């Protein structure tokens, strides 16, 4: 899932915004692509040091600490955006903030916990790539299909 998400947002290289570092899996996949810069916003106090340590060996990574919504006005525009914060309670804020973060051709995706292609987030013209997966039995995601949202501006 994270590999496919990274491949989509990094397809054209450029400047990438990742909202939510988590375990750093997607960040690692993003760096398997040729990207100019990688801006990561992380809010969780236990994850911030892990993100900073991960980024310390990379010259093109900037870690911004805090809530993404509180810092959004200081951000630039990006060629790719991956939104993966804990829970989806801020997706409406994210969808209404996208226009200030994108330019022509920007690719956007997000963690989609929905079991189908339903677009609950008021983001028009979203395509979905169906991925066949085999999650571990003890995983919180227990479907054999994942619907990767793809939005290009």
Range-by-range predicted roles:
Residues 12-24:
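Conserved class I S-adenosyl-L-methionine
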Residues 37-42, 110:
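Conserved SAM-binding motif I beta-strand of class I
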Residues 41-75:
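S-adenosyl-L-methionine
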Residues 46-50, 54, 89-153:
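C-terminal substrate-binding/active-site "lid" region of AdoMet-derived donor-dependent transferases
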Residues 69-81, 85, 89:
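A short acidic, Gly/Pro-enriched loop at the edge of an enzyme's catalytic core
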Residues 1-14:
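Conserved alpha-helix/loop element of class I SAM-dependent methyltransferases that forms part
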Residues 23-35:
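Conserved SAM-binding loop of SAM-dependent methyltransferases across substrates and taxa
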Residues 15, 36-37, 60, 107:
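Residues at the starts of beta-strands that form the adenosine-phosphate
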